[in-house]
Amino acid sequence: MSRTVRLADGHVPALLVHPHLDAATGRATRPVPVLVWMHGRTVTKELDPGRYLRLARAGIASCALDLPGHGERFDAALQDPARTLEVVERMAGEIDAVLADLDASGEHAGCRRAIGGMSAGGMAAMVRLCRPHAFGCAMVECSIGSWRWQERRAMFDPARVAAMDPFRHLGEWRDIPFLALHNELDEWVPAEGQREFVDALRARSAHSERITMHCYGPTGAPNEHAGFGRFASDAKERGTAFLVQWLLDGR
């Protein structure tokens, strides 16, 4: 069901999970929708197999990417909190080449695709969504779309914030279904910053009911940021239901 490959001319390590993978050939037997997913800082693409398994059982493939400096392209310096926006910038710039390889594979031909991520990975997803794209929906977890809320953190780089902050580029955002899951007591990524962004999306949307934010807490997760603790199963179910609705049902 899964295999590890290199995409984007070999620069981006990816874990591909496909519900119809032929074990003998290593190829998919029929195309299905796909979620392009990016993890958070200091972890790897293999972190959350439960997510990929649930989606595969629902008929959705996953393409999980290692962020720059992480996993198979480990670089301790790039995991420094002060370089978070550099990592986000590089990852957002690599997504198109990843998509080109996914398209060339034929494993998702004629199917919808989604993008999402956790924390820094979610930030990269939102940056990419402020440029022309063909994603049908997006989902992020413990991430932030209004970066002014991180001004006192080491990651805050005024030049990169001006260039990439999704809240400052709402005019370039295409109106698609969007789900944000968050921990209300998140110590690293304030829920208020994501709520401000989601509220702005809803205010601009012709279909505001398709844009939702759900907060948990207290969860017991480390720093109320690394996952959803006692609510992990509920978060997985919400995410899966959202993707099934917009990738498979297409409502």
Region annotations inferred by a language model:
Residues 1-30:
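N-terminal cap/lid segment of alpha/beta-hydrolase-fold proteins
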Residues 43-44, 70, 146, 221:
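Active-site loop signature of alpha/beta-hydrolase-fold enzymes
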Residues 148-206:
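The feature captures the conserved acid-bearing segment of alpha/beta-hydrolase catalytic domains
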Residues 82-106:
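Alpha/beta-hydrolase active-site loop
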Residues 55-76:
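Conserved alpha/beta-hydrolase
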